[in-house]
């Protein structure tokens, strides 16, 4: 006859874990954005969290903006985060582009007044198809404006302008002089240091 195996006691790892509240940075009004379990607070550091702008502001029209945060320190049962970037949803970007229009992408790394580097990706959509020379000039104007604006703003001020859409509005008003634009959005940002 076969021998019965000795039963091993299974340890429930969930009982060892504690729940930590995740909060946004001070420039995003120190709001609570979720909870996460961890056995040790050190395991939380570096963990990424993604939240829509609607969840933070309550404004449903900002549903398409996703903000990315990373936990950088833990104090008690509160995990504090830092902003690492944002992006817009692909379905929103696709809805802006139609046949007979031009999609102009401009990407640049800008440096803020307090020596922080941020990569910004701007999307401009024209009302009709633009010539390649017009598109090239528009990219140049957009990149110059981004660099100029970032140089005179602190990191927190720049992020607020990017997320609220005020920088995109400023780009729109300057770039529409070259060719009529339908829409301008900063579709992605990434903090480099």
UniProtKB/Swiss-Prot annotation:
* Gene Ontology BP terms: translation
Cite the GO molecular-function annotations of the record: structural constituent of ribosome
Is Ribonucleoprotein among this UniProt entry's keywords?
yes
Q: Does the keyword Amino-acid biosynthesis apply?
A: no
Belongs to which family? Answer: Belongs to the eukaryotic ribosomal protein eS1 family.
Signal peptide extent: none
Protein name as it appears in the record:
Small ribosomal subunit protein eS1
| Gene Ontology CC entries for this record | ribonucleoprotein complex; ribosome
Q: Which InterPro entries match?
A: Ribosomal_eS1, Ribosomal_eS1_arc
Record's keyword terms, sorted: Ribonucleoprotein, Ribosomal protein
Q: What is the lineage of its organism?
A: Archaea, Methanobacteriati, Methanobacteriota, Methanomada group, Methanobacteria
